[in-house]
Amino acid sequence: VSAFRAAGARKGDRIEHASVVPPALIEQLLELALGIVTQPNFIYERGDAYIRDIAREEHPFLYRVNSLVNAGVPVAFGTDSPFGHPDPWVAMKAAVDRQTISGNLLGEDERIAPVSALKKFLGGLGDPFTLRTISPGEPADLCLLNLPWKDLCTDLASAHVRMTIRDGEIIYSRD
């Protein structure tokens, strides 16, 4: 943040990861109009190590989502593959339930709704905070599921993906 303050933040600037975001930092993010691209899958994948190795008073500040969104900070998700699992559904589920791989809760106040978690992956590469649309002239990027969204909300998992289409071309099909 100090580098952005010194150099001057510009539209589109963002911080990747934002692993630890204490309340005072949220104010600075808003002041500089910086967005965050974070990886909630690390709560699931590495959360038990965080609980063990990071001071308890910092646990509420790890991979925050809900607090940032409520404050008005733009937030998008990534997986940080290959350092994190490449499956975006792991990240979405972790943002919703905030459970570690062993089932411990970490930052439960940072939970978000399933549809909000999905939207955090729907931005464009150049502008991850603006949702892409399905309309004439836009790239045909689609993910077809094997059950209705209302049912998927209770079981966020890549096992429900039937087909993935990028730029109108099938790049994955379960059939």
Question: What does each of the following model-derived ranges do?
Answer:
Residues 1-13, 18, 23-147, 164-165:
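His/Asp/Glu-enriched, well-ordered alpha-helical/loop segment
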Residues 149-155:
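Short, Lys/Arg- and Gly-enriched loop/turn segments at beta-strand edges
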Residues 157-159:
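Short, small/polar residue-rich loop motifs at catalytic or cofactor-binding pockets
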